[in-house]
């Protein structure tokens, strides 16, 4: 209620955008002030959930004094644990609200769904992946429908009865109980579907038009191995996940350099789409990458921290 929220000002602090994402950090700064809200009458579970969300991002909860319309009072506030977390750009709540709030809300929702579960610590480690899933969902939900996309509107015709977050690791696994329309305008009963929550990826075939040669990489793949393939080292185009806030074409160029040690001079988009829509949300952006292979020597590349070889 309105009685549980009030405005407050903290002296000798200022709020900046964080370096690591679209969120605020409060930094000591003499003769400045920061505006905020006080939340009163929080329950113990409320505080535990707030601590789970904030403390995992290198914040600390500490007592401090703030000014309100009723005078000075003592509160607990979340402060960043390192001064190097902040950029030099002053925080704007209105900019955050218009540009980032929808993504942050969805990411926080997924993140907090893992509170109190065996995946609680994993969620903090994998938060950028959670952010990326939220970014993709917001982008897809707001994108205009093309002339080639048929079928009823998703939001008005597909009813989600229950969403269960079954697993979180490098990817996530959800179970969705839902109803959806048939082409004869009838509606299905409640169906349970298990879905691998993948991400977006750029797939690039490096090509030298002068030599008329392509470049492939060979690497171990868990899919063939778990299928029983005796030779799970496969030849394939360069591919890699698109990071949060990264453009597909930038990811394509980055991946070619990381996995093959060569620069792309030009990208030609082939198409984009779902490689396996019945099992995963993964979405590929497919490119031809123009390269110069005249002096290229095969070698061992990849990011070792990611287990690439």
Regions found by a protein language model. Name each.
Residues 2-155:
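Glycine-aromatic micro-motifs
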Residues 65, 156-167:
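Short amphipathic beta-strand and strand-loop transition segments with alternating hydrophobic
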Residues 32-40, 235-245:
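Short histidine-centered catalytic/ligand-binding loop motif
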Residues 190-191, 200-203, 238-309:
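Unchanged
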Residues 166-211:
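Acidic, metal-coordinating catalytic segment for phosphate/diphosphate chemistry
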Residues 48, 58-61, 86-88, 215, ...:
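A short, polar/proline- and glycine-enriched secondary-structure boundary/capping micro-motif
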Residues 194-237:
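N-terminal strand-loop-strand
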Residues 38-39, 61-63, 173-175, 216, ...:
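Conserved hydrophobic/aromatic beta-strand scaffold that supports enzyme active sites
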